Regions:
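Substrate/cofactor-recognition hotspot
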Residues: 128-129
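Short alpha-helical scaffolding segments that buttress acidic/His motifs in well-ordered protein cores
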Residues: 62-66, 83-90, 118-123, 134
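Residues at alpha-helix boundaries and the short loops/turns that link adjacent helices
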Residues: 38-41, 95, 109, 125
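Acidic, glycine/proline-rich low-complexity segments that act as flexible tails and inter-domain linkers
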Residues: 2-79, 107, 133-149
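Mid-chain, well-packed structural core segment of small domains
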Residues: 83-86, 90-116
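Short Asp/Glu-rich motifs
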Residues: 124-125, 142
Length: 149
């Protein structure tokens, strides 16, 4: 079964990796730590302070599952996950989330050149208009970072 984790006897360990989290609270806390490390504590705190009671459950889901389980897996380095996110968010044309993940990619060790190459590669497969928007957002963030240094 190539493509996902297996135990020594060849069985999939996907379900056990999710089930082995001792509690939702621990997974949520781990997710919050990873989320803050990748996106920056200030960004996460600001975002969560603005969450309505209606939207709070989806933020909890994202923190626990996305950050606490998926981003915490050993299969890919954080930099690789960040570059993949930039490509996927470009394909989905999600500028707001894309901007946060540009900062996250830099925090995870991606270079400006690697971000640029990821966006160029993405342009070919998802379309130039989507990539142009991502280049615009990334450029604005990179300029902002340069001006703050």
């Amino acid at each position: 079964m190539s493509g996902h984790a297996t135990s020594e006897d060849g069985r999939s360990t996907l379900g056990t990796s999710i089930a082995s989290a001792s509690t939702h609270v621990e997974t949520y806390e781990q997710g919050m730590n990873v989320r803050r490390e990748v996106l920056g504590a200030e960004h996460v705190d600001r975002s969560l302070s603005q969450v309505s009671d209606f939207a709070r459950p989806v933020q909890e889901l994202v923190t626990e599952y996305c950050w606490g389980i998926v981003w915490s897996r050993d299969g890919l380095e954080r930099k690789t996950r960040s570059l993949l996110n930039l490509a996927m968010l470009t394909a989905l044309n999600r500028s707001h989330e894309f901007g946060a993940h540009v900062r996250g990619a830099l925090a995870n060790g991606a270079s400006v050149a690697e971000i640029q190459e990821t966006l160029l590669q993405t342009a070919i497969y998802v379309g130039v208009p989507a990539a142009l928007e991502s280049f615009r957002v990334a450029d604005a963030i990179l300029r902002e970072i340069d001006n703050s240094e």
